[in-house]
């Protein structure tokens, strides 16, 4: 089976607000399979936003596991992120999962990987996926040089990314806290 490429997920934290956005394209090889995938969702009674890049089945498994970790740790995103990364890296079955996650609550944002990375950004901006570097660059420029709020920054940065990255489209889903 061909590798499924897809997605740009971007989170922006600015002036006490947080937003996470993702595009809707799913591609297999050089074929666009879906235009309206939802790769950003709310967890933990709407208090946490999570987005994924990579295999959808793997990501949903990780979303479920992350939400269990949130419940176990009383909603602490940092503790749940570290515990998920630890389990993901050490468990033989989970190690095979191919996805990256961005998770955010009102106070913290993290990128979580299967190699054990739990990264909190210095500047409030995180991006993953095939268009991640384009989105990260555009968002950082907009954060530093405009008065736009996080949702507006994500919209502009993701549209720039969709114009450049063939695996990213303009069908955006953006969640805010």
Curated annotation (Swiss-Prot):
Top-level taxon: Bacteria
Active site: 7
Single GO biological process annotation from the record: proteolysis involved in protein catabolic process
InterPro entries named in the record: ATP-dep_Prtase_HsIV_su, Ntn_hydrolases_N, Proteasome_sua/b, Proteasome_suB-type
Binding of Na(+), residues: 162, 165, 168
UniProt-listed Enzyme Commission number(s): 3.4.25.2
Subcellular location: Cytoplasm
Catalysed transformations (reactions): ATP-dependent cleavage of peptide bonds with broad specificity
Keywords: Allosteric enzyme, Cytoplasm, Hydrolase, Metal-binding, Protease, Sodium, Stress response, Threonine protease
Name of the top EC class for this enzyme: hydrolase
Predominant subcellular localization, coarse grouping: cytoplasm
Regulation of its activity: Allosterically activated by HslU binding.
GO cellular component: HslUV protease complex; proteasome core complex
GO molecular function: metal ion binding; threonine-type endopeptidase activity
UniProt-listed Gene3D superfamilies: Glutamine Phosphoribosylpyrophosphate, subunit 1, domain 1
Similarity remark: Belongs to the peptidase T1B family. HslV subfamily.
Subunit and partners: A double ring-shaped homohexamer of HslV is capped on each side by a ring-shaped HslU homohexamer. The assembly of the HslU/HslV complex is dependent on binding of ATP.
Function comment: Protease subunit of a proteasome-like degradation complex believed to be a general protein degrading machinery.
Protein name (Swiss-Prot/TrEMBL): ATP-dependent protease subunit HslV
Provenance organism: Leptospira biflexa serovar Patoc (strain Patoc 1 / ATCC 23582 / Paris)
Gene field: hslV
